[in-house]
Every structure is written in structure tokens, then in C-alpha cells.
Amino acid sequence: MGRIIAVNSNCYHGYSIEQAIDGIAAAGFRYIELTATKGWTEHVFPDQSFERLWQVKERLAEKGLTPFSMSGHCNLMDPARIHDFISNIRLAAFFGCGYIVSSIGEAHLSDQAVASNEVVAEHIRALVPELEKYGLTLVLETHGDHGSGRILKEIVDRVGSPRVGINYDTANALFYGNVDLGADLDASMDAIRYMHLKDKGGERTVWDFPALGKGWLDFPLVFDKLAKAGNDCPFSIEIEFTQAGAKDLAEINQAVKDSAEYLTAHGFVL
């Protein structure tokens, strides 16, 4: 089996899951990362009715898209949010996903709790039986205060389970972590199980994440590092535009198509 290449439905923030499914399929992709991020993009969510969730499942099948992962960000430092994350695990299982993505802290809400890496590892370790029960792998995203692969690898190593790895978000590692990309990839490569391919435009600290190939992030370096390490982790494309967002649906659809063309030009098969 070749590398899975998907698109994160969060690219369609502010638009419906149906619009996301249609645009991603039209660009030639066969896989999707569903977004269930509280307070931000709730394309699917545990409190939606069974009928509504089934409609989404049928639309995916109709368009030939496999929901192989789900973005279910919760603050894993906060005991009060662990139950919410377990609900997200079960929702991911409902869609037949193999991966669930979360940052350590909240992705788009204020953190109500902070904790040491050891405490976070304990919280995650307690989730492993749920992950095993549903056949899921939890991938921790480079985000916020945990913006480097190096930091996340320390937590993953403390957890010590094959069910837990890193989701290396390429642009986040620069935007949040201010890393030397090559060195950080080297330091965390053996724990990277998943990758958000996200480009970076503008100044490093500016919210600017365009279509792949439209920014300045060194993707050939990333691809070379992965190839040399024999790491064929799934790719999930994420495009978040600028703080103002995409101007319309057509701009998102074009950015998704541009990203597909960028990857195929680099020898990848969608």
C-alpha cells in the first residue's frame, strides 16, 4: 500500500462538510481527515444526531472518499476534557478512522488547565485502552506550547505505546515552535506517524498558510528526510489561508487543486 494522502476538512472552515467533501473529491483525492474541533470547525461532532452523522457517511461513500482520520482536538492536560476526547475517539471509530489527531492543549479554545509532560503522558496512557478497543492511533500535533517534534517526542516516549505518535504539522513547527525544520525532523523522526502538510507564507509569526507550493516552506527537505528515514506516514493537507480566511468557496477549491498538483509534480500519487 502506498502513502495515504488526504485533505483536512478544516481547509473548509466556515463551510459545510458537504462542500468540503465535494471539493476534496473533485480535486482527485481519495482520503479525508474529518474535523471535530470544538468551537472552531465542527464538521462532525459527538452531539450531532445519528441521522446527521449517517448522512455524512453516505456522502463520503457517494464521492469515493475514505475518512481515514479525524481531528478531535481537546486539552489533554485538563482532566475535565478527557471525557470529551473519549467521545471523539468513539466518533472516529463510527466513521472507521484509523487515526485521531489532537494537540496537547486546546487548538482554538482557551486552556483551562496546564500540566507537566509527565502528567500529560499519564493522561494519554489512560486513553490507550480506548484506542486499542477501537483500533485507533492517537497522533499528537505540533501546536502551541508543544510546537516542536522534539517536545512531543519526549511525551510520546513517556507514554510508551505504539498507539501514540506525533502528527508533525510542518507550518506549526515554524509558526509556534520556531524550529530548524531539518534538525527538528531528525530529532523526532522515529515518533512521526502522521503529517499535516501545511505551507507557510508571509513572516514566520503571521497567520498565513496557503496552498502547498505557494509559500516558502522547504517541502523538498521534508520529503527527502522522510524518504531517507523510510517513513511513509500519511499526509493530510491543511490550508488555513490568512487571518481573514478564504474569500469564498472557489478560492478554497482552487487551493486544494493547486496542492494536489504540487504533490503530483513531486511524484506522489493521490
List PLM regions with ranges.
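Histidine-acidic metal/acid-base catalytic patches
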Residues: M1-S9, H13-Y31, A61-G64, G96, ...
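Short catalytic-loop micro-motif centered on adjacent basic/acidic residues
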Residues: A6-S9, S69, T137-T142
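Active-site-proximal loop/turn and secondary-structure-junction residues that shape catalytic pockets
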Residues: C11-H13, A36-K38, H73-L76, I104-H108, ...
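Active-site acidic/histidine proton-transfer and metal-coordination neighborhood
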Residues: E18-Q19, Y31, W54, R59-K63, ...
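A short beta-strand-loop structural module common to alpha/beta enzyme folds
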Residues: R30-T41
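Conserved beta-strand positions in the central sheet of alpha/beta enzyme cores
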Residues: E33, S69, V101, V139, ...
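Alpha-helix N-cap and loop-to-helix initiation/capping positions
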Residues: V44-R52, A80-S87, D111-E122, G147, ...
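The substrate-binding groove and active-site-proximal loops of carbohydrate-active enzymes
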Residues: S71-D78, G213
